[in-house]
Amino acid sequence: MKNNCETGQQSLAINSNKKVAIKDGGIIFSTLMLLPAILHFLVLYCGVNLNSILLAFSVPKSDGGQEFSLYNFQRFFANMANPESQVYMALFNTLEYYLLKVCKYALTSIVSYFFYKKLPGHIAYKILFFLPSMIPDMVYISIFKQFISKYGPLYEFLGLFGYKMPSLLLEPSTAEGVIMFYHFWSGFGPQLLIQVGAMNRIPSDVIDAAKIDGCVGFKEFWFIILPLVFETIATYFLLGIVEIFQSTGPFLFFVGSDMPEVYTLQYWIFQQTLGGASNYPAAIGLVFTMLALPLVLISRYFINKVETVTY
């Protein structure tokens, strides 16, 4: 009896040691796997952004050094009070692109449902929406510019009705609208693929049961489809909030860098940094980072409040 107890205690001790060894080995393995990502975060994110924060609170001195100052922030708030400043216009354009992105998310869900139900004409619409995604941007934009150019196909067509179309890309007021239209139309491809894929995963039994209860058409879309693919839509929405101040469009392909009225905040900061002015852009980046952070956290909080549907 005594030998059996000793044997049992030894077995327990061996099993306990094995569990500790496995646990320690798992921790070491996990640490080694995460080490490259941690180093990448520390060097390329924390290191770079720490330098940006220091630049935001400093101004260049005559001897080439830097001195502490709040001038960059004072300049920013002064520019934001002036609608004619480049920063103000760049921010306004950026928010326009973001609102366009939100509208595109909503329309993508409707178009995805159209494809999911395989309604008449869905193949033609697939070609129409996916074509810009399959052809390189530079090629497709060149074709699009020729189509809307003076004496181009659109110009000649409108001329049949007595309307002489102006050069749309020469004036900021019309150039921005053309660029946003192209950006809106050409960005459906990837989102459509993901949302249609999410809808195709819905069990047919769920759809059949909804039809028996009289849930068809818009009711099916609103009460059945949307709740079941909400996680996919919410992920896109949250990513959009993260990039709210980074929204931009392909305006460089259309008008180059000679039209500041169509700049977005992201490109304006890049252009300023390229010209050697790092302090003021760093301050602007810091301000909008501090604005975006609570927006992301609040949005995530309310998204998590929505009850997810599993199937």
Q: Which stretches of residues belong to each language-model region?
A:
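A structural signal for multi-pass alpha-helical bundles of membrane permease subunits
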Residues: I22-Y311
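Short, Lys/Arg-rich, polar N-terminal cytosolic tail immediately upstream
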Residues: M1-D24
